[in-house]
Amino acid sequence: MTTVYDVPADLLINRVAEELKNDSKVKSPEWVNFVKTGVHKERRPENPDWWYVRAAALLRRVYIDGPVGVNSLRTHYGGKKDRGSRPEKFRRGSGAIIRRALQQLEESGLIKREENGRVITPEGRSFLDKAAAEVKKEVEGLERY
């Protein structure tokens, strides 16, 4: 059986993002065109569908790391802030973006909140595993793994 660990992350995330676009409960908010993904970024994302890509990446991250909280996900999506001539410092990613995307994934039934953080539901696990199986069929060279 194919799992998330058997396929490249970028191909899986793009496939899941396409499927999340069709989900009625995962929608990009109105403010999505005006925000950066963290204080360490200078510009907003160039991809117009970046909300679905981030939601797919969060779903994969909850699958791999769960139970996981918003704060640790902020650390994962953070980066170095350019402070001019001063040394760079690490800054965490946007919590509002992560929180809202996780809430939408909860409404879809793909993840659930527990005491220690958010974990993937059986529906979410099968959703990701099916997407991984489709990616594995499409990409040549992955069949032998």
Swiss-Prot record:
<comment type="subunit">
    <text>Part of the 30S ribosomal subunit.</text>
</comment>
<dbReference type="InterPro" id="IPR027548">
    <property type="entry name" value="Ribosomal_eS19_archaeal"/>
</dbReference>
<dbReference type="GO" id="GO:0006412">
    <property type="term" value="P:translation"/>
</dbReference>
<comment type="similarity">
    <text>Belongs to the eukaryotic ribosomal protein eS19 family.</text>
</comment>
<comment type="function">
    <text>May be involved in maturation of the 30S ribosomal subunit.</text>
</comment>
<protein>
    <recommendedName>
        <fullName>Small ribosomal subunit protein eS19</fullName>
    </recommendedName>
</protein>
<dbReference type="GO" id="GO:0003723">
    <property type="term" value="F:RNA binding"/>
</dbReference>
<keyword id="KW-0689">Ribosomal protein</keyword>
<dbReference type="InterPro" id="IPR036390">
    <property type="entry name" value="WH_DNA-bd_sf"/>
</dbReference>
<keyword id="KW-0687">Ribonucleoprotein</keyword>
<dbReference type="InterPro" id="IPR001266">
    <property type="entry name" value="Ribosomal_eS19"/>
</dbReference>
<dbReference type="InterPro" id="IPR018277">
    <property type="entry name" value="Ribosomal_eS19_CS"/>
</dbReference>
<dbReference type="GO" id="GO:0000028">
    <property type="term" value="P:ribosomal small subunit assembly"/>
</dbReference>
<dbReference type="GO" id="GO:0003735">
    <property type="term" value="F:structural constituent of ribosome"/>
</dbReference>
<dbReference type="Pfam" id="PF01090">
    <property type="entry name" value="Ribosomal_S19e"/>
</dbReference>
<dbReference type="InterPro" id="IPR036388">
    <property type="entry name" value="WH-like_DNA-bd_sf"/>
</dbReference>
<dbReference type="GO" id="GO:0022627">
    <property type="term" value="C:cytosolic small ribosomal subunit"/>
</dbReference>
